[in-house]
UniProtKB/Swiss-Prot annotation:
The keyword DNA repair does not apply. One of its GO terms (molecular function) is rRNA binding. This is Large ribosomal subunit protein uL5. Coiled coil: none annotated. It comes from Picrophilus torridus (strain ATCC 700027 / DSM 9790 / JCM 10055 / NBRC 100828 / KAW 2/3). The lineage of its organism: Archaea, Methanobacteriati, Thermoplasmatota, Thermoplasmata, Thermoplasmatales. Keywords: Ribonucleoprotein, Ribosomal protein, RNA-binding, rRNA-binding, tRNA-binding. SUPFAM superfamilies: RL5-like (SSF55282). Part of the 50S ribosomal subunit; contacts the 5S rRNA and probably tRNA. Forms a bridge to the 30S subunit in the 70S ribosome. This is one of the proteins that bind and probably mediate the attachment of the 5S RNA into the large ribosomal subunit, where it forms part of the central protuberance. In the 70S ribosome it contacts protein S13 of the 30S subunit (bridge B1b), connecting the 2 subunits; this bridge is implicated in subunit movement. May contact the P site tRNA; the 5S rRNA and some of its associated proteins might help stabilize positioning of ribosome-bound tRNAs. Belongs to the universal ribosomal protein uL5 family. GO terms for biological process: translation.
Length: 176
């Protein structure tokens, strides 16, 4: 008899991991935040700019106020292992959205393994976003010709994402 196996195209994979530091101002502090991201991810960060002017905070539209790095494939997996170590492998249940993505923050870059406080850099926290997708079929939403929506049965649920992180990264979910 044949044993039943899961369809490999329904397997969940990590699409990308986005690491963001929002500084809120341009200048030397922004450059130090970029240096922190480069030390942690070994990738050159991209600068994010303000979408609108806020006079109270002295921010003009188009002014660089943050840095981010997008990691994919093996780089994303290795960074996530370090990030979960910094969070003691515990993520709150409210960090997951209904689309199966996960978001959490790290309050200080010195929580990462092997990082020491540098007074020239200062203290920077960061936001981490993990975007999941199924192994196949997501191109139909992005392609130019015959665009379609992802069917409901192919969408990733919050529970599937939690199960994936528990199995692959030994993450404990707090607040179940």
């Amino acid at each position: 008899m044949m044993e039943t196996t899961e369809n490999s195209m329904r397997e969940i994979v990590i699409d990308k991991v986005v690491v963001n530091i929002g500084v809120g101002a341009a200048g030397e502090r922004l450059n130090r935040a970029a240096k922190v991201l480069e030390l942690l991810t070994h990738h050159k960060p991209a600068f994010t700019s303000a979408k609108r002017t806020v006079r109270d905070f002295n921010i003009r539209k188009g002014l660089n106020i943050g840095v981010k790095v997008t990691l994919r494939k093996d780089d994303a997996l290795s960074f996530l292992k370090e990030a979960f170590y910094a969070k003691d492998y515990k993520i709150p249940v409210y960090s997951f959205d209904k689309n199966g993505n996960a978001y959490f923050g790290i309050s200080d870059y010195t929580d990462f393994k092997g990082m020491k406080y540098d007074p020239d850099i200062g203290i920077f926290g960061m936001d981490i976003a993990i975007v999941f997708r199924r192994r196949g079929g997501y191109r139909i939403e992005k392609r130019r010709i015959k665009k379609m929506h992802i069917p409901k049965k192919m969408r990733i649920s919050k529970e599937e994402t939690i199960k994936y992180l528990q199995e692959n990264f030994n993450v404990k979910i707090i607040g179940d």
